[in-house]
Amino acid sequence: YSSAASDVYKRQINERNGKRELWAQMIMLWCLQSYYEYSNDQRVIDLMTNYFKWQLSVPDEQFLEDYWENSRGGDNLLSVYWLYNRTGDQFLLELAEKIHRNTADWTRPSALPNWHNVNIAQCFREPATYYMMTGDSAMLKASYNVHNLIRRTFGQVPGGMFGADENARMGSIDPRQGVETCGLVEQMASDELMLCMTGDPLWAEHCEEVAFNSYPAAVMPDFKGLRYITCPNQTVSDSKNHHPGIDNRGPFLAMNPFSSRCCQHNHAQGWPYYAEHLILATPDNGVAAAMYAACKATVKVGDGNEISLHE
C-alpha cells in the first residue's frame, strides 16, 4: 500500500538478469484480489489501478521479458480482467492486449514455449483467457489443444496429470516420472478457471480427478510435509539423488526444504481455490453446484431471493 501513491514500482520490483521481474507481483495481485473479495478494502482497487497504469507505461521490449513472467503472463491478464470488472477503466483493455502480445505463445499446435510441467498446467489457459475479451474461438481451442497435447504423449499418470519431473521429456513418458506438487495445484486452478470461462463440465470433472486422486498423496493433511514429485505406486521416499531418472539432481523424492524452494510456495492453494469454485453463479441468475465437497453456501438467486445450500 505504501507504494500505491508514488512511482516507486521501479525500485521495488526485483531485477533478474538485468530485467524487471514482474512474476512476484503477479502472485501478490492474486493475494490482493482474495483479500478485497473478503474485505472490500478500497486500497486494493487504488493500488492495482496505479500499478496497472505503470505496467502500461513500460515499453514492450522491457515487459514480461524474464522466463517465468513471460510464461505466466496469463496470471497477470486475469488480474487485469478482475479489476476491469470492478472499475470499467478502458485503459485496462489496452493493457490486456499488451500482456497477451508479450506473453509466451501458448497457441502453438505442437511445439510448446517450454515443457516445464508447472508452466504447462498454469499457462495453457492463457489463450482461453484472452478469448474472453476477443471472442476469437481459435484462442479457446488452443487451450484445449495444449491440455490434450501434453496428455497424448505424457499422460500416463493416473489421477489427471502427466509425466513431467520438472520437465516433460521424450524418452521419459511412463508413470514413474510422476509430477510436481506445484503442477497439481496449478492444474486444479486452471481447471477451475476454465470451468468458469466455458461452462464445460469436463473441467469440473478433471479438477475433481486431480484433487481427490493426486493432490492428497502429495501433501500431509496439516501441510507440514510435502513431496516435490508424486508417482503412482511410489515405494521409495528417500533423500538420494535419482538423476537422470528424475530430471533434477538432488533429494527430490522426499522434499528437503533446505535444498530446494520448489513447491513450498503454492502447495497450499489447492483446497482454498477449490472451495471457492464449489458453488457458482449461472447466467440466468441461478446457481450451480459445479464441483463437489462438503460445504454450506448462502446465495442470492432469481430476483434476489436468498437461499442456503448444504452439501
What are these model-derived regions, one by one?
Residues 52, 56-59, 63-105, 113:
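Solenoidal tandem-repeat scaffolds enriched in leucines and small polar residues
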Residues 40, 56-60, 88, 104-108, ...:
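Helix-capping and short linker residues that terminate individual alpha-solenoid repeat units
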Residues 1-5, 9:
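Single conserved hydrophobic/aromatic residue that forms the stacking wall/gate
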Residues 6, 55-58, 62, 99, ...:
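A short secondary-structure junction motif
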Residues 11-38, 74-91, 95, 117-151, ...:
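Aromatic (Trp/Tyr) and acidic
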Residues 43, 64, 68-71, 111, ...:
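A structural signal for alpha-helical segments
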Residues 32-39, 44, 51, 55-58:
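An active-site-proximal structural segment forming one wall of the substrate-binding cleft
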Residues 8, 63-67, 110-114, 133, ...:
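Short coil/turn linkers that connect adjacent helices within long alpha-helical scaffolds
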